[in-house]
Structure formats: structure tokens, C-alpha cells
A protein has these predicted regions:
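FAD-site-proximal beta/loop scaffold in flavoenzymes
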Residues: 215-239, 322-394
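A conserved FAD-binding loop/helix module that cradles the flavin
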Residues: 253, 390-409
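Feature captures the FAD/FMN-dependent oxidoreductase FAD-binding
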Residues: 105, 110-114, 162-208, 301-313, ...
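Glycine-rich dinucleotide-binding loop and its adjacent helix/turn
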Residues: 88-104, 163-183, 204-260, 364-375, ...
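Rossmann-like dinucleotide-binding cores of NAD(P)H-dependent redox enzymes
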Residues: 133-176, 227-229, 254-301
């Protein structure tokens, strides 16, 4: 047995299970204690030291802390760690005079952050008080990245998002909106001391099955559709909607569909419930709104009638499992057609780097994802960093925050 290295900061995080499970290692016992004492502003600021976005994460975090909570070992449910974060944010007094300030005298270093999502904003949050000049470049006309475009406002109100972004940008970041980077080479030529890429995983996966383009206007890519809804480009949908996929994006799509006028919304899952990627509380919220979760359905073809989408053909699956619950065999037992006026594809997201030239010393792996150091998030080209979903594929905001912290260091 090796002696404990108490100089390693991870040692102190591991003492508290929930704090260690949180990617940003938020001091969970500390802020819950402050809430119990009625010190909501102090609880908010303690949260902000590590997770940067207490009000946002108090609503939409994936809650990796809660399965690790020790109360879950002796009670039916863990402490509501995530919701308590929201309590602190919602009840905090004006804290603007207690936020970090950027010094008037800069240190002479210029950093470019590509994308105005949580990873880039965290980099700015950490480096602005140290005298760095931060330029955040965002293709959309508003900051926030996928927090803005893919999380519906009924879950994450715009005023909460705006307030916590303004807390960072207000320290002096230069925000260039509506400015899409077309070439990494040109960005490098601007002479920044470092570049951080936090563009997320902005490309939704396709489902290339027979009939896909027979009525393409009625078949939507999940994240693109959510963005169109967020910016009021789409204001209605058909009465019968099928959502293909059962991750968190699929659940954003199904609940948004109801608010756009759908009468029947079904989320179609290929496997049984224990294999779902979606968070249990997201599933509960959807089912409370009478969304039907249909399991063991593998999509086979889009069905059109007279050139118009009318449904989807599925293989109905059965599975065998071993003693550990793993699938050992699968078989098709029959086919089934379900009616649909619209179909939304939410089967995953991918990174997209057409703007990063491949002759700049930035190496990509077989999945076309940049190779980065797992601690610093620096790519194979010194001074160029990738973080958040752009580095490791779709995860949650709290992971993007932690990547931003580490890259800033």
C-alpha cells in the first residue's frame, strides 16, 4: 500500500463522495450548510468558485454528484444537491460587488476563445481576473452556445442564462457575435498567445434509412430543430410526433413538441429502459407531461403516403441478458408501423471541424476528434486547446466547465 499523498488536491476532494463525483469538485457540504443557515448569497458565491454557473446548473446539470451521495445508501433518494444549487441562485441578494474584477493593467497576453458556450466562458472567467485579454468569438448573434440553442427556455429561462453570462463578459471580455471562424490558419495569424476551442458538438447524426428524403421537410435533426425553436424559426409541429432516440436531447425535443401543439408524442428507444442515456429525472418530467416512452423499437424505414410522411416502420426487438444484465442476444419478433406527422432524429451528436486545416500540426484521431492532453487539454500544436464537447463529444455543462478550468490553468 502506498502512503496517501496529502499534497495532491484530489485527496481532499475524494474525502467527500459527492464533491469528488462532481467534475468541477464543487464544495457540496459547504454550500448546503450555508443554505441551511439562510446565507444564500454566500452559498451562491461558494458554488460559483468551482462551477461558475450556479443558476444554470441548478436547473439543467446532469447531477453526477447525486448517485454518489451517501444518503442514497440509507434512504430512498439522495440529497437534492442540484436543486439546492438553484435555491442558492434564486434567493441570492445582489452579489455584483463581490465578483472577481479584472485588473486595469493587463499582463500583455491575448487569448482567443472560439465559441461562447460554457467551456469558453469558464476560460474567460478564470483568466480575466489575472490580467489576460480575452476575445470570445461566437457564430450566433447571442452568447451561450448549446445552452442557448438546445435547452428550451421552459427549463432554462433566458434571464438566468443572460445574468450568469453577463457576470463573466462584464469583467471585460471582448465578445464578437455573429462572427463564424472559417479558418484556424487565419485565426493563428492574428497573433494570439493561445487559442481555446469550445465549439461543442454541433452536428446532429443522420438516420439514413429508406424513405428518409421522400418528405424531408417533416424529418428533423434534433439539435438543429431545437435551435430553430429557440430562435422562433419554428413555431408549430404536427399532431403526431415520433422522437427517435432516448438521450437528453430527445427529451428536450419531446417536451418542446408538446408546447408547439403536438397531441401525441412518442420517444422511440431501441433497447430497454435500463440502457437509456437520458437522466432519470428527465424521463420523469417527460412522462409527467404524458410523453410515451416506447422501448425495443429499432427504426427500419420512413413511411410516406402520396409523397407525404405518414409514419415510421420499426422492427420490434427482444433481448436476452446474462446474470449481470448485459445483452447477450437480440432478435426481431415482428414489424410495426407507427403514425407520424413529424419525426425528430435525436440519436446523437458529433464534432465538426471543417474549419481546422489538417496541416497545422493539430492531430486528429480516427473519429476526427482532436488529440489533446487529458490534463491540460492542449492539442498537439502548442498553444491550441480544445475543451467541452468539442474535445470529447457530447457531455454535460459541468464537464465543459471543468475542461475550461483545466485549460485555463
Amino acid at each position: 500500500m502506498q502512503p496517501t499523498n496529502t499534497r495532491d488536491p484530489d485527496y481532499f476532494h475524494k474525502v467527500v463522495d459527492c464533491q469528488w463525483a462532481c467534475p468541477a469538485h464543487t464544495d457540496v457540504p459547504g454550500y448546503i450548510r450555508l443554505i441551511a443557515q439562510g446565507q444564500y448569497t454566500e452559498a451562491f458565491l461558494l458554488n460559483r468558485e468551482s462551477n461558475v454557473f450556479p443558476g444554470i446548473l441548478g436547473r439543467v446539470c446532469d447531477r453526477p454528484c447525486e448517485p454518489a451521495c451517501r444518503r442514497g445508501r440509507v434512504e430512498d433518494k439522495p440529497v437534492a444537491i442540484c436543486r439546492l444549487k438553484r435555491v442558492a441562485a434564486d434567493l441570492a441578494d445582489d452579489y455584483s460587488d463581490r465578483l472577481p474584477k479584472a485588473p486595469a493593467k493587463k499582463n500583455g497576453k491575448r487569448i482567443a476563445c472560439v465559441g461562447a458556450g460554457p467551456a469558453s466562458l469558464t476560460v474567460a472567467n478564470d483568466l480575466l481576473p489575472l490580467g489576460y485579454e480575452i476575445v470570445i468569438v461566437e457564430g450566433l448573434q447571442v452568447p451561450g452556445g448549446l445552452m442557448r440553442s438546445n435547452i428550451p427556455s421552459f427549463r432554462l429561462p433566458a434571464e438566468v442564462l443572460d445574468r450568469e453570462i453577463d457576470d463573466i463578459v462584464g469583467m471585460g471580455a471582448q465578445l464578437k457575435l455573429g462572427h463564424r471562424i472559417e479558418s484556424m490558419q487565419k485565426l493563428l495569424a492574428e497573433g494570439f498567445d493561445a487559442i481555446f476551442v469550445g465549439t461543442g458538438a454541433p452536428k446532429g447524426k443522420e438516420l439514413k434509412l429508406p424513405g428518409r428524403y421522400d418528405d424531408g421537410a417533416r424529418v428533423h435533426i434534433g439539435i438543429e430543430w431545437l435551435e430553430s425553436v429557440a430562435f422562433d424559426h419554428i413555431k408549430m409541429i404536427g399532431e403526431q410526433v415520433l422522437i427517435i432516440g432516448v438521450g437528453n436531447t430527445a427529451l428536450e425535443c419531446c417536451r418542446s413538441s408538446l408546447r408547439l401543439g403536438a397531441k401525441s408524442v412518442k420517444v422511440m428507444a431501441r433497447k430497454p429502459r435500463q440502457f437509456f442515456k437520458a437522466s432519470a429525472w428527465e424521463l420523469d418530467d417527460a412522462e409527467e407531461e404524458h410523453v410515451e416512452i416506447v422501448v425495443n423499437r429499432s427504426p427500419k424505414a420512413f413511411v410516406t403516403t402520396g409523397g407525404k410522411l405518414s409514419g415510421m416502420l420499426f422492427d420490434v426487438m427482444e433481448y436476452d441478458f446474462d446474470a449481470r444484465g448485459r445483452i447477450t442476444a437480440e432478435r426481431i419478433v415482428r414489424e410495426e408501423i407507427l403514425p407520424a406527422d413529424d419525426i425528430v432524429l435525436a440519436i446523437g451528436q458529433e464534432n465538426a471541424f471543417p474549419w481546422v486545416e489538417r496541416d497545422l500540426g493539430i492531430e486528429f484521431d480516427k473519429w476526427d476528434v482532436p488529440k489533446v492532453d487529458l490534463k491540460t487539454f492542449e492539442s498537439t500544436r502548442p498553444g491550441v486547446f480544445f475543451g467541452g464537447d468539442s474535445a470529447f463529444g457530447p457531455k454535460n455543462i459541468i464537464w465543459a466547465v471543468e475542461h475550461g478550468h483545466q485549460a485555463a490553468i
